A protein has these predicted regions:
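Class I SAM-dependent transferase core
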Residues: 2-66, 104-115
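Alpha-helix termini
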Residues: 52, 86-90, 126
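Conserved class I S-adenosyl-L-methionine
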Residues: 66-75
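Conserved SAM-binding loop of SAM-dependent methyltransferases across substrates and taxa
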Residues: 76-89
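Conserved SAM-binding motif I beta-strand of class I
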Residues: 91-96
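S-adenosylmethionine
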Residues: 97-156
Length: 156
């Protein structure tokens, strides 16, 4: 069972270009480094995170429609950062209200040179028409907030 990020990436992603592998390696190194102090991902188990979180995020790319995406409650950038890496021609908005997550996302954006990413510190309940994108995604998001929304609000 491989334990280093590079070996796990090779095992999981069979046709990954060197460029994409390099970007994922940088991102994952940052993610696990920050996780030690900020708890920004579900697990410190690298193999689990890559196989379960990163690869699942990558698989979303074939289902995504439109030219722009908003990742609500982006946290550590999953799936938003992964979508941005594999879709450099698409705009990706990473939305979170926690300063520690925003700091990480800004650093990841800079380190990965992701010009297609816009990091926004804001609660998703604040309606901002400037943040309108073609597709909205979220994962590990509290149902309490969604359950308070009207039917129409869930699709706006």
């Amino acid at each position: 069972m491989p334990t280093d990020v590079s070996s796990i990436l090779n095992e999981v992603f069979h046709n990954l270009t060197e460029d994409k592998k390099h970007l994922l390696q940088i991102y994952l190194d940052l993610l696990f480094k920050w996780h030690k102090t900020s708890n920004i991902v579900s697990s410190s188990d690298k193999e689990y995170v890559i196989k379960r979180e990163v690869y699942d995020s990558y698989k979303l790319t074939k289902f995504m429609r439109g030219q722009s995406y908003t990742d609500i409650g982006s946290g550590g950038g999953l799936p938003g950062i992964i979508l941005a890496i594999f879709n450099p021609e698409k705009e990706v908005v990473l939305l979170d209200r926690k300063s520690s997550f925003i700091d990480f996302l800004e650093l990841a954006k800079a380190e990965l040179m992701l010009d297609n990413v816009n990091v926004v510190k804001q609660d998703f309940l604040v309606k901002d028409t400037q943040l309108m994108t073609d597709t909205v995604i979220f994962k590990n998001f509290s149902n309490k907030l969604i359950s308070k929304m009207t039917y129409e609000e869930k699709f706006i």
